[in-house]
Amino acid sequence: MKITYIHHSSFIVELKNHILLFDYFQGNLPQFNKNKKLYVFSSHSHHDHFNKSIFKLNKIHPGVTYILSKDINSPKSENIKLLDANEKLVIDNLEIETLQSSDLGVAFIVKVENKTIYHGGDLNWWHWEGENSPEENAYAEKLFKDSVDKIKGKIIDLAFLPLDSRQGNEYYLGFDYFMRSTNTKIAFPMHFWRTYSLIKIFKASNYALNYKDKIIEINHENEEFQL
């Protein structure tokens, strides 16, 4: 399994017979192996998670399938599947499940080639100290936990989780809760706004003490990882 970090929350997961592209909006995409089926996921319509340019991929990789959150304004096509929160879809050899985001759209759980892959989109514990009221922060916490608790104890082979530097001292909350709530084997931070140093800080912190070896350090865009 090869993982390529594109930019922000965008990753490519290449398996033996399938290629998954998550939340692309900018960055350099490699040439995809045309012998493998390509699936493009977009978790919601925010500008840092979606770009309509993804629909051009169909011209260079025939047979691409799009799995998009329903809030995305997309063309009508048989190869475009729109999903709401808490829905399930089986397409080809993929089993796809969605969770309600605590912001907009969905998080994806994808079962393919005996792997369970999670991409959180903007599902995160969005605690904004000094910006939101205590009541707003409590509500954001509840939204996040209500979704993650639905997969409590689940075995996840590969997870992509927000680690947002803008949250100040609370940057770790969502990542930490997810790791403690699930049986996740490998976790990639995302949504860190090019603050690569935050990953090292988090891995060295007491918060990550019990799972630091499961966290993959990202150092630059288009970095590849063989797992």
Model-derived regions, located:
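Short active-site oxyanion
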Residues: 1-2, 62-65, 186
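Core dinuclear metal-dependent hydrolase active-site scaffold
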Residues: 1-35, 79-155, 219-227
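Binuclear metal-ion centers of metallo-dependent hydrolases, dominated by the metallo-beta-lactamase
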Residues: 4-8, 77-89, 171-227
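Active-site metal-binding motif and surrounding structural segment of the metallo-beta-lactamase
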Residues: 26-72, 149-160
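Active-site environment of divalent metal-dependent phosphoester hydrolases
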Residues: 27-30, 46-50, 72-76, 87-89, ...
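Short amphipathic alpha-helical segments
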Residues: 33-34, 52-55, 79, 131-132, ...
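Structural recognition of the beta-strand scaffold that forms the well-ordered cores
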Residues: 119, 158-161, 188-189
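A short, acidic, amphipathic alpha-helical segment used as a generic capping/interface helix at domain edges
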Residues: 143-149, 168-177
